[in-house]
């Protein structure tokens, strides 16, 4: 994403992001209760993948359990490629059979719900999970579909023309969340 003119507001600092991920991992563990061995974290490309890995590390610190972590590319499932332009497909890596599992879809920002609809379609091509839970770091509203996260790091009401930017060390050389407001 290129820089845009206007105001940039810090929403989560690196420390805030770390604490939020710890809280989200705790919530997932609590909801899973005795089914921790059935959990699979699937990060949606691009930033959902490193977020899923960070959540997996947090779960391991909390519970001593190592969860399978996968990567989900939804390029061929999108219904909005004509609007957003062509995308280069990324790797889908599903480490275990999803049948009978509890899949936690991990995404950085939920907006219209279209990405998640595409992800749900993709997941079912890899098995029939017992349940699919949605974890979104930021929920900015403006839903076009009846999709709501099971776990939310931060609800952030935004204007449609604003941009929420999740920054991760491995991609952006720093951690945090920013809101970019147009001028």
From Swiss-Prot:
Source domain of life: Bacteria
InterPro entries: PRibTrfase_dom (IPR000836), PRTase-like (IPR029057), PyrR (IPR023050), PyrR_bifunctional (IPR050137)
Ligand binding (substrate): 46-47, 87, 107-115, 140, 164
Gene Ontology biological-process entries: regulation of DNA-templated transcription
Catalytic activity from the UniProt record: UMP + diphosphate = 5-phospho-alpha-D-ribose 1-diphosphate + uracil
A Pfam family reported for this protein in Swiss-Prot or TrEMBL: Pribosyltran
GO molecular function annotations of the record: uracil phosphoribosyltransferase activity
Keywords associated with the record: Glycosyltransferase, Transcription, Transcription regulation, Transferase
EC number(s) per entry: 2.4.2.9
Positions of short motif PRPP-binding: 103-115
Top EC class, one word: transferase
Entry function: Regulates the transcription of the pyrimidine nucleotide (pyr) operon in response to exogenous pyrimidines.
HAMAP family, alphabetized: PyrR
Protein name, entry field: Bifunctional protein PyrR
């Amino acid at each position: 994403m290129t820089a845009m003119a206007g105001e940039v507001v810090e929403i989560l600092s690196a420390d805030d992001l770390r604490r939020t991920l710890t809280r989200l991992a705790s919530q997932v563990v609590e909801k899973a209760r005795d089914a921790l061995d059935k959990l699979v974290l699937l990060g949606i490309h691009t930033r959902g993948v490193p977020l899923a890995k960070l959540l997996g590390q947090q779960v391991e610190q909390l519970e001593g359990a190592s969860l399978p972590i996968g990567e989900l590319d939804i390029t061929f499932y999108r219904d909005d490629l004509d609007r957003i332009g062509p995308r280069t497909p990324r790797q889908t890596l599903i480490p275990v059979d999803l049948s009978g599992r509890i899949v936690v879809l991990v995404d950085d920002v939920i907006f219209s719900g279209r990405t998640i609809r595409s992800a749900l379609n993709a997941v079912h091509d890899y098995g029939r999970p017992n349940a699919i839970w949605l974890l979104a770091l930021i929920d900015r509203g403006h839903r076009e579909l009846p999709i709501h996260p099971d776990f939310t790091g931060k609800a952030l009401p935004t204007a449609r023309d604003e941009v929420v930017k999740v920054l991760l060390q491995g991609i952006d050389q720093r951690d945090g969340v920013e809101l970019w407001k147009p001028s």
